[in-house]
Structure formats: structure tokens, C-alpha cells
């Protein structure tokens, strides 16, 4: 009988807005019992430190390199994760010995799949010591060692969640609109395909922050007052990324931000929401079949302008669009839940990535285990 474990997943994504903390009970296979979720936002000063970490990481050629300033940021990130875990457990009445493992993503500061290089800062050993809970971390690297792109990793969890829709004979596509958007397609035959689909919130967030000092477009309100600037949209949508037959994982630096003089605040936000939606549809053209259903998670599902654009485009192809909540899930918690699920799979030596998800030659496990 497969062992059911209690796991907490910790996710700090490319949007760099905070830590998502989620608990599940799972056997790392088909059994999933979803528990509580909590978000812990970063303050502006620490978001600035993470942006500095991106700059410090550019010249690195080894995933273990930590120049002194980057190491300081890594330790601060780890401390904030430890504090988040402690706050989560106090809030929901959990003791350390009630949790079997933490799945710790860390913060991606460099991702160059063509060079076989990915760097996530975050000290798993230090986190295990501070929380008194075993930690699985650095889950992307082994995939890249074996020729994969190192992303996306969440598809294994999406496939486990998709069971009820497959029973209805539907091809389902999960869309995670984070800083970068990615797709997980589960066909009617159960086959999984997954890849990054293009820019998600990153370009919108960068634009709004540059123009207003706010870190995002709340509810898509700013974009909702603008119009699409076709020439700017086409500049993004004509990227070689959308033309090649080989899918690859993306870094937040793969698409250059708009320049301040290129559009009004509202038109820029609307154009970039259109680009985010159209990117999903364009990349969806590489799927084995058109999904009957798109399930949207990640922060982008809260941008009404982006969602309206995407829904119209999908409906033209005969597809239905639901938010994660409309499908019975929690769109805020899903990535953190996935990291908890992957940690349990790692403990059991089960594959985290597959040829259809990262391009790795054969299914491989991953992750490094740190004990208290």
C-alpha cells in the first residue's frame, strides 16, 4: 500500500510578489486531499533585493555559485520561508512532527535551458534546520542533467487533478498565468504535453510599475480602459518563440518590456493583456488536439481584461474557459500544492518530469533531501 504523507509546498514565483504556502495529504500518485492555503506577500524592499539577485546571477555559469551578496539574499529568502512556515503552522494548529516534508521551490534567478543551467536560490538545509521538518528542494536540476528544459514541473500534479474531467471524455488544458504562462494538456488518452506558452503577468506588471509605481494592474482595471495597439502586440506575437516547432521553457527576460514612450498607461496594459491571452492560443496550436476545456490558475485569472480576451479567443475554437475555482480548485494554491505533491513523489523516487513535459529523454525523478 502506498504511503500517504502530509506535505507543505512553498512557492515563490517569477512575479516575485510573495510566498504561497499550501498543505496537502497525498501518496504522490492519485490520492490528493487538499488542505489550507496562505499567502505571505513580500515588502517592496525585499522585492528590490530579488530583482538585484537577477542582476547578480547573469554572469553565473554554475548553479552552485553564490557570490557574497547573492548568498546574503538567499539566506534572507530562506529565513522568510521559515517564518512563513511557522506562521502557517501556528495559524492552522499544526506541529512540526505532523508534517512529513516541505517542498521548497526557492526563487528562480537564472534559467537558461539551452545551456543546461538553472539556478533557484534558497538553502534547503537551513530551512530544514529552522523548521525541524525535512525539505525537498532543487527539483529542476536533475531534469536538466538528463537533457530536459527544467520546466514546467507542475504538470505531474495537473495530471493527477484532471482525473474527473478525463472520465467525462474531455481533453483538458490547465493554464497557469503567472509571470510566465504555461500549459498542461491532458488528452482523452491520458497523454500529457506541457510547455511554457509565453509572457503572462510579467510584462503587464513591469509596465504598470514603471508607469505608476504600483506592482500590478488590479483586476485588469487599467487595461480595461485602454485599447490594443496592434503594432506593439504583433511585435511580441511574431517572436521566434511562437514559430519554432520545438517548445522550450522561458525566463522572465525572454520578452523585453515596453518602453515608456510607446503607449499610454491604459493602452500598454490592454495590449500586454492581449499578448498574454493570444500567446496561450498561439502556443496551444502545438497541442495534439484542441482542448474542450481550459482551466485557468495563477494570478492572471484575476485580470478580467486578460480573461475576457482569452475566453473570446478560446470560444472561437470551440473551447470552454473556467477559472480554477469554477472547476473546483484553488487557483492561488495550486502551484504551492504542486510543490508539496512533487516533494512526496521525490521521496518515493517517482518521476517529476516526462518527455512530454520538459523534453527529457525518459521520465526522471529529482530533488535534494535535507533533514533537520
UniProtKB/Swiss-Prot annotation:
The gene is anmK. GO terms for molecular function: ATP binding; kinase activity; phosphotransferase activity, alcohol group as acceptor. Belongs to the anhydro-N-acetylmuramic acid kinase family. ATP binds at residues 13-20. The keyword Protein transport does not apply. Its EC number is 2.7.1.170. Catalyzes the specific phosphorylation of 1,6-anhydro-N-acetylmuramic acid (anhMurNAc) with the simultaneous cleavage of the 1,6-anhydro ring, generating MurNAc-6-P. Is required for the utilization of anhMurNAc either imported from the medium or derived from its own cell wall murein, and thus plays a role in cell wall recycling. This is Anhydro-N-acetylmuramic acid kinase. Keywords: ATP-binding, Carbohydrate metabolism, Kinase, Nucleotide-binding, Transferase. GO terms for biological process: 1,6-anhydro-N-acetyl-beta-muramic acid catabolic process; amino sugar metabolic process; peptidoglycan turnover. NCBIfam families: PRK09585.1-5. Pathway: Amino-sugar metabolism; 1,6-anhydro-N-acetylmuramate degradation; Cell wall biogenesis; peptidoglycan recycling. Gene3D superfamilies: 3.30.420.40. Disulfide bonds: none annotated. It catalyses: 1,6-anhydro-N-acetyl-beta-muramate + ATP + H2O = N-acetyl-D-muramate 6-phosphate + ADP + H(+). PANTHER family: ANHYDRO-N-ACETYLMURAMIC ACID KINASE. It is an enzyme of class 2 (transferase).
Amino acid at each position: 500500500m502506498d504511503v500517504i504523507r502530509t506535505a507543505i509546498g512553498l512557492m515563490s514565483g517569477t512575479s516575485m510578489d510573495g510566498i504561497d504556502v499550501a498543505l496537502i495529504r497525498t501518496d504522490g500518485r492519485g490520492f490528493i486531499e487538499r488542505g489550507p492555503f496562505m499567502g505571505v506577500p513580500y515588502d517592496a524592499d525585499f522585492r528590490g533585493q530579488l530583482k538585484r539577485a537577477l542582476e547578480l546571477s547573469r554572469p553565473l555559469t554554475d548553479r552552485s555559485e553564490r557570490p557574497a551578496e547573492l548568498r546574503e539574499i538567499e539566506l534572507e529568502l530562506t529565513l522568510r520561508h521559515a517564518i512563513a512556515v511557522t506562521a502557517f503552522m501556528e495559524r492552522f494548529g499544526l506541529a512540526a512532527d505532523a508534517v512529513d516534508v516541505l517542498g521548497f521551490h526557492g526563487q528562480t534567478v537564472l534559467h537558461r535551458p539551452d545551456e543546461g543551467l538553472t539556478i533557484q536560490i534558497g538553502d534547503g538545509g537551513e530551512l530544514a534546520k529552522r523548521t525541524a521538518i525535512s525539505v525537498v528542494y532543487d527539483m529542476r536540476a536533475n531534469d536538466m542533467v538528463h537533457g530536459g528544459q527544467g520546466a514546467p514541473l507542475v504538470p505531474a500534479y495537473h495530471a493527477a487533478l484532471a482525473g474527473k474531467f478525463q472520465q467525462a471524455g474531455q481533453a483538458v488544458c490547465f493554464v497557469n498565468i503567472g509571470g510566465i504562462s504555461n500549459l498542461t494538456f491532458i488528452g482523452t488518452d491520458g497523454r500529457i504535453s506541457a510547455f511554457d506558452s509565453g509572457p503572462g503577468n510579467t510584462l503587464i506588471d513591469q509596465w504598470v510599475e514603471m508607469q505608476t509605481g504600483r506592482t500590478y494592474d488590479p483586476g485588469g482595471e487599467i487595461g480595461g480602459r485602454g485599447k490594443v495597439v496592434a503594432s506593439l502586440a504583433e511585435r511580441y506575437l511574431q517572436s521566434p518563440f511562437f514559430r519554432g516547432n520545438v517548445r522550450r521553457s522561458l525566463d522572465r527576460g525572454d520578452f523585453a518590456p515596453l518602453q515608456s514612450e510607446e503607449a499610454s498607461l491604459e493602452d500598454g496594459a490592454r495590449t500586454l493583456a492581449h499578448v498574454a491571452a493570444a500567446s496561450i492560443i498561439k502556443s496551444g496550436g502545438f497541442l495534439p488536439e484542441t482542448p474542450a476545456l481550459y482551466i485557468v490558475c495563477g494570478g492572471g485569472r484575476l485580470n478580467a481584461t486578460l480573461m475576457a480576451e482569452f475566453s473570446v479567443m478560446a470560444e472561437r475554437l470551440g473551447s470552454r474557459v473556467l477559472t480554477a475555482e469554477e472547476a473546483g480548485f484553488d487557483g492561488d494554491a495550486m502551484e504551492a500544492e504542486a510543490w508539496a505533491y512533487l516533494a512526496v513523489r521525490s521521496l518515493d523516487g517517482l518521476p517529476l518530469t516526462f518527455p512530454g513535459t520538459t523534453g527529457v529523454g525518459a521520465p526522471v525523478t529529482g530533488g535534494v533531501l535535507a533533514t533537520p
